């Protein structure tokens, strides 16, 4: 029979976890390719690109090896001791790994949105993180191996879930129904990630960054909600004495005291709900909404929106201040070139420059960020390029 050869439940379990991991890894690889690419589509530093791609692959395969070892140990203990030692801590594992992924994805998303303005600067930062081999401390280590950490924790979390969930399903599934759905799930998930990677390489950089960041934040917001729900379910399972979420959709399968709403269908923990399992992996769907999971989802988006507004405001404000400070230098150069006296002014109002916008504003923001992140004084950045940008902005007003 077909069910003895191909288990649909195993296929969707593997596809769900592979899909989430492949999306994050493919977006990260596209980010590296786009950052180290010039306007003509040529790689500016092939050696640096290979090093960071290698970090991504090493992080992914290291996590895969670890999760196979840990997951295999849990499954081996289950069959040897006839006791599912994973079930007592499953939600804790998932919740902790989800929170780690949320932090890493959120930080990466904020960084990616600035790449279009600071592509060359990001290339230099990536180069420094590799070159600074003598740097010590956790912070420097994290920067140096940043492209290793995100795929490592992502693949570790997803891979561990695959091994344990597939092992759990295997209790009621013939051994012959394992290989084909696992292979097919891995292939389909990896193919989707590959197409995202290829699409990210041919897309316009700005559109790619916006689209990929939106996808990452959708996944991250779902992970935030799921992490909260995992901790709530861990408490509920200890109160009920079992894994209540996998017993069905009715009363007793969810913490009803903290539930805001619940529907008796679409439970992503049920292996027969393949489509809802995919929604759970990408968007964080759950058929039960608790106060904690809903509030954490909303608070996460409010936090992201606040940080983005703060970044936008600080860049615009810094641009205005820098333009005002460079005003005297621009005026002096204009006076020298035209041999006509020009009244100098250093105040922002007298200089009559509003907040930069559009392309000229982007150029000013590049300079502002370079000055702000540099340890040298502002006066050292008054080069011809800066003066040209200031002149363009003045002429537009």
Swiss-Prot record:
Region (Disordered), start-end ranges: 337-364
InterPro entries, alphabetized: FTR1/Fip1/EfeU (IPR004923)
Biased composition (Polar residues): 337-346
Modified residues (Phosphothreonine): 340, 357
Localization per Swiss-Prot or TrEMBL: Membrane
Domain of life per record: Eukaryota
Topology of this chain in the membrane: Multi-pass membrane protein
Basic and acidic residues bias locations: 349-364
Pfam families linked to this entry: FTR1
Primary localization: membrane
UniProt entry tagged with the keyword Iron: yes
Keywords noted in UniProt: Ion transport, Iron, Iron transport, Membrane, Phosphoprotein, Transmembrane, Transmembrane helix, Transport
Bilayer-spanning residue ranges: 61-81, 92-112, 177-197, 292-312
Any one GO cellular component localisation term in the record: Golgi apparatus
Modified residues (Phosphoserine): 337-338, 346-347, 355, 374-376
Alphabetized GO MF terms: ferrous iron transmembrane transporter activity; high-affinity ferrous iron transmembrane transporter activity
A GO biological-process term: iron ion transmembrane transport
Family designation: Belongs to the oxidase-dependent Fe transporter (OFeT) (TC 9.A.10.1) family.
Known role: Permease for high affinity iron uptake.
Name listed for the protein in its UniProt record: Plasma membrane iron permease
Species assigned in the record: Schizosaccharomyces pombe (strain 972 / ATCC 24843)
Taxonomic lineage from the root: Eukaryota, Fungi, Dikarya, Ascomycota, Taphrinomycotina
């Amino acid at each position: 029979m077909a069910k003895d050869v191909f288990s649909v439940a195993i296929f969707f379990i593997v596809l769900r976890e592979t899909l989430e991991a492949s999306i994050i890894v493919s977006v990260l690889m596209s980010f590296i390719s786009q950052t180290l690419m010039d306007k003509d589509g040529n790689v500016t530093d092939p050696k640096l690109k290979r090093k960071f791609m290698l970090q991504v692959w090493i992080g992914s395969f290291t996590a895969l090896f670890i999760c196979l070892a840990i997951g295999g140990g849990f499954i081996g203990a289950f069959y040897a001791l006839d006791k599912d030692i994973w079930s007592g801590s499953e939600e804790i594992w998932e919740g902790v790994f989800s929170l780690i992924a949320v932090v890493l994805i959120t930080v990466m998303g904020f960084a990616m949105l600035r790449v279009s303005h600071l592509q060359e600067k990001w290339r230099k930062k990536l180069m420094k993180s590799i070159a600074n081999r003598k740097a010590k401390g956790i912070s420097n280590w994290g920067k140096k191996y940043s492209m290793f950490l995100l795929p490592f924790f992502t693949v570790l979390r997803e891979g561990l879930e695959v091994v344990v969930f597939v092992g759990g399903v295997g209790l009621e599934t013939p051994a012959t129904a394992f290989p084909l759905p696992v292979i097919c799930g891995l292939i389909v998930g990896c193919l989707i990630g590959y197409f995202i990677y290829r699409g990210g390489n041919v897309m316009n950089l700005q559109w790619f960054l916006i689209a990929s960041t939106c996808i990452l934040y959708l996944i991250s917001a779902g992970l935030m909600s799921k992490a909260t729900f995992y901790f709530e379910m861990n408490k509920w399972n200890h109160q009920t004495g079992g894994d209540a979420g996998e017993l069905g959709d009715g009363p007793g399968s969810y913490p009803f005291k903290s539930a805001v709403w619940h529907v008796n269908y679409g439970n992503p923990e049920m292996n027969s709900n393949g489509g809802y399992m995919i929604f759970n992996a990408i968007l964080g769907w759950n058929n039960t909404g608790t106060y904690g999971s809903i509030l954490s989802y909303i608070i996460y988006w409010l936090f992201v929106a606040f940080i983005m507004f703060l970044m936008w405001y600080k860049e615009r404000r810094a641009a205005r201040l820098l333009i005002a400070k460079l005003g005297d230098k621009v005026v002096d150069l204009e006076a020298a070139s035209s041999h006509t006296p020009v009244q100098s002014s250093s105040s922002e109002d007298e200089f009559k420059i509003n907040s930069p916008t559009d392309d000229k504003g982007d150029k000013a923001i590049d300079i502002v960020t370079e000055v702000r992140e540099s340890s040298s004084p502002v006066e050292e950045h008054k080069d011809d390029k800066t003066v040209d940008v200031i002149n363009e902005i003045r002429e537009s007003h």
